[in-house]
């Protein structure tokens, strides 16, 4: 059974903002390893459009930064599923469009052979958390305080107890916390 891993960066005060992160070589290498061990990425519309608007262009025109360019190739080649009620089509290669999150479909995806499944969209992390489908949370805490923004767990309705599996620290001051939900 494949694990469904919620992997996302957030500020120390709990907000998700792609501009509020340190994207140095060490962080990119970390995410390259994460993508190398994944077989599928799941996105919501907003995160999909953000990623799709940038990474394919890096594949075509590499930056010269080895970890960043490697990340671009990895994310370009991985299988992607986008959940959106408003998108009519998706143009990024290896991408399928689904209209809504259906628990049985996600469970079926987890049962398939292959590498782990990653989700990195705040709204989808909440939806999949509500459906009790997340096997592991990898929360990349950035050494930044925003004071406002999109809080990751704002719409989670029920308490979720987590067990700390490990931590990983980075030279820039970021820390990734690895958690798994404990049984209720």
Protein language model regions, located:
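Enzymes that bind and transform nitrogen-containing heteroaromatic metabolites
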Residues: 1-184
């Amino acid at each position: 059974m494949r694990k469904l891993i919620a992997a996302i960066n957030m500020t120390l005060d709990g907000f998700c903002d792609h501009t509020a992160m340190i994207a140095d070589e060490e962080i990119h290498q970390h995410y390259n390893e994460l993508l190398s061990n994944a077989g599928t990425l799941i996105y919501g519309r907003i995160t999909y459009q953000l990623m799709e608007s940038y990474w394919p262009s890096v594949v075509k025109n590499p930056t010269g930064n080895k970890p960043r360019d490697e990340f671009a190739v990895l994310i370009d080649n991985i299988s992607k599923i986008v959940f959106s009620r408003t998108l009519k089509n998706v143009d990024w290669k290896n991408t399928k469009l689904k209209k809504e999150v259906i628990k049985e479909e996600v469970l079926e995806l987890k049962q398939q052979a292959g590498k782990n499944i990653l989700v990195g969209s705040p709204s989808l992390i909440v939806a999949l958390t509500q459906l009790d489908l997340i096997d592991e949370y990898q929360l990349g805490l950035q050494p930044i305080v925003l004071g406002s923004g999109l809080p990751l767990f704002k719409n989670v309705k029920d308490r979720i107890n987590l067990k700390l599996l490990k931590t990983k620290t980075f030279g820039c001051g970021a820390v990734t916390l690895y958690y798994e939900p404990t049984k209720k």
